Amino acid sequence: MMTYWPSPAKLNLFLYITGQRADGYHTLQTLFQFLDYGDTLHIEPRRDGEIHLLTPVNGVENEDNLIVRAARGLMKAALESGRLPAGSGADISIEKRLPMGGGLGGGSSNAATVLVALNHLWQCGLSVDELAKLGLTLGADVPVFVRGHAAFAEGVGEILTPVNPPEKWYLVAHPGVIIPTPVIFKDPQLPRNTPKRSIDTLLKCEFSNDCEVIARKRFREVDAALSWLLEYAPSRLTGTGACVFAEFDTEPCARQVLEQAPEWLNAFVAKGVNLSPLHRSLL
């Protein structure tokens, strides 16, 4: 039985760096919202206990891929708690639409979809809290995808408060470069002391991203993409980049601008949604 599972993108509608811990991790305040756009995972349960990724990613060993690591992590957690049915395994393939290094959470979303889907298909019965805790061992952004609701995040991104920001339309553009997260977070000029504010205060302020100035300075493609988008609508960086986005009140307005996109810009239009398409598929 082949099953299909959404693995949606996310946007950071704002991102503020509030400090840096002794272990080097940055503390932040950010607002996550999902998009009705993303990858699709195809998962076929096996009965021999094997995990096979049928669509390898160039340059990434299968055992290092977050998809495989998530599947093996769930298998281990369920086995240790006596909740793994004998022979549980899976063939997994992916239809990839989200760019690597784009700030859309593609890898984290893939991992979360595997955790949620296999917990369902294998009938392990792990709670959302257990899955989120497991997800955090794979990456700071995985828990928000596991929980499946737009959220205000603090700490290193793991302290989540569900929120319901307006569900606007977005033109999301990838400028053709990959930005490794450490490149931004290790930059000495990155703002690291933005004052912490309450969620109510932040939702009333104009949204921005502390990483944007560094991304624009170090990657001229990001600067060019944002300069173009800002001619049409409020626009900013998502995550540490490289993707940028402009917000619109209606789909036709977003698509009208998309039609004028320069050839060097890879862009798409999607709606912001507060309930993840993954979790909507489970309803």
UniProtKB/Swiss-Prot annotation:
Protein name as it appears in the record: 4-diphosphocytidyl-2-C-methyl-D-erythritol kinase
PANTHER family: 4-DIPHOSPHOCYTIDYL-2-C-METHYL-D-ERYTHRITOL KINASE, CHLOROPLASTIC (PTHR43527:SF2)
This enzyme's EC code(s): 2.7.1.148
Enzyme class: transferase
Signal sequence segment: none
Gene Ontology biological-process annotations: isopentenyl diphosphate biosynthetic process, methylerythritol 4-phosphate pathway; terpenoid biosynthetic process
Pfam families, alphabetized: GHMP_kinases_C (PF08544), GHMP_kinases_N (PF00288)
Pathway: Isoprenoid biosynthesis; isopentenyl diphosphate biosynthesis via DXP pathway; isopentenyl diphosphate from 1-deoxy-D-xylulose 5-phosphate: step 3/6
Family recorded in the similarity comment: Belongs to the GHMP kinase family. IspE subfamily.
Binding site for ATP: 99-109
Active site: 10, 141
Keyword match Protein biosynthesis: no
Keywords, ordered alphabetically: ATP-binding, Isoprene biosynthesis, Kinase, Nucleotide-binding, Transferase
Catalytic activity of the protein: 4-CDP-2-C-methyl-D-erythritol + ATP = 4-CDP-2-C-methyl-D-erythritol 2-phosphate + ADP + H(+)
Gene Ontology molecular function: any one: 4-(cytidine 5'-diphospho)-2-C-methyl-D-erythritol kinase activity
Protein species of origin: Salmonella arizonae (strain ATCC BAA-731 / CDC346-86 / RSK2980)
Keyword Disulfide bond on entry: no
Matches recorded under HAMAP family: IspE (MF_00061)
Role summary: Catalyzes the phosphorylation of the position 2 hydroxy group of 4-diphosphocytidyl-2C-methyl-D-erythritol.
